[in-house]
Amino acid sequence: MAIILGVDPGSRITGYGVIQCLGRQQLYLGSGCIRTSGEDLPLRLKQIFDGISEIIRQYQPDEFAIERVFLAKNADSALKLGQARGAAIVAATVANLPVAEYSATQIKNAVVGTGRAKKEQVQHMIQQLLKLPAAPQADAADALGVAVCHYHTNQSLVALSGRATTRTYGRYR
């Protein structure tokens, strides 16, 4: 039984999703968005850190998974996104959680079956997979997708090796 916190980082809106895995079953525990306020980037990063830290305290996850930075058209946006990811990763590290990272293509492939899926397709499949009454908000759905991707990746590793491994700090342990 593992609880996984998935995060879809953003400097303005950071989505989070929490699932519990019981064997092959994935149960929805919660999801939402951390909406930062103000123009001051350091303050927004603190809000992300504090928000993720509170979610960790509330749900007590065993594992943490986050979306990797994608190539943005605007270099400034990519840097801000990287800093938002850093704030979330530090919150997980402070809580001694193993950190796993996945590309958007890996996440979409795990959830929808194709790495080129649209946001609406991810929302729909998350609703179906987790048996939700309605599709979650886009950022929350993406975060739940990160958690589902992490679950499926670990299940594949278990099947291949007979034991689970988690990617942490760029290495497996």
Swiss-Prot record:
Pfam families reported for this sequence = RuvC
State the reactions this protein catalyses. Endonucleolytic cleavage at a junction such as a reciprocal single-stranded crossover between two homologous DNA duplexes (Holliday junction)
State the active site.
Answer: D8, E67, D139
Binding site residues for Mg(2+) 1: D8, D139
SUPFAM superfamilies in the cross-refs: Ribonuclease H-like
Q: Which UniProt keywords apply?
A: Cytoplasm, DNA damage, DNA recombination, DNA repair, DNA-binding, Endonuclease, Hydrolase, Magnesium, Metal-binding, Nuclease
Would you tell me the Gene Ontology cellular component terms? cytoplasm; Holliday junction resolvase complex
**Which PROSITE patterns does this one have?**
RUVC (PS01321)
Q: Name one GO molecular function term.
A: DNA binding
Disulfide pairs here are: none
InterPro entries registered for this protein in UniProt: RNaseH-like_sf, RNaseH_sf, X-over_junc_endoDNase_Mg_BS, X-over_junc_endoDNase_RuvC
Can you cite a GO biological process for this protein? DNA recombination
- Under which EC number(s) is this enzyme classified? 3.1.21.10
Please state which protein family the record places this protein in.
Belongs to the RuvC family.
Function, please? The RuvA-RuvB-RuvC complex processes Holliday junction (HJ) DNA during genetic recombination and DNA repair. Endonuclease that resolves HJ intermediates. Cleaves cruciform DNA by making single-stranded nicks across the HJ at symmetrical positions within the homologous arms, yielding a 5'-phosphate and a 3'-hydroxyl group; requires a central core of homology in the junction. The consensus cleavage sequence is 5'-(A/T)TT(C/G)-3'. Cleavage occurs on the 3'-side of the TT dinucleotide at the point of strand exchange.
Query: This chain belongs to which protein, by name?
Result: Crossover junction endodeoxyribonuclease RuvC
What is the scientific name of the source organism? Shewanella sp. (strain ANA-3)
